[in-house]
Amino acid sequence: FLPIIASVAAKVFSKIFCAISKKC
């Protein structure tokens, strides 16, 4: 499991959470 993948996944999750909660 690469740190780079974890970093990208965190950014993607952040965008998804932002879209769902609409608290950007």
Swiss-Prot record:
Annotated Gene Ontology cellular component terms: extracellular region
Tissue specificity statement from the Swiss-Prot or TrEMBL entry: Expressed by the skin glands.
Disulfide bonds: C18-C24
Location in or out of the cell: Secreted
Pfam family, one: Antimicrobial_1
InterPro entries assigned: Antimicrobial_frog_1
UniProt keyword list: Amphibian defense peptide, Antibiotic, Antimicrobial, Disulfide bond, Fungicide, Secreted
GO BP annotations listed: defense response to bacterium; defense response to fungus; killing of cells of another organism
Protein's job: Antibacterial activity against Gram-positive bacterium S.aureus and Gram-negative bacterium E.coli. Has activity against C.albicans.
Stated family: Belongs to the frog skin active peptide (FSAP) family. Brevinin subfamily.
Record protein name field: Brevinin-1Pc
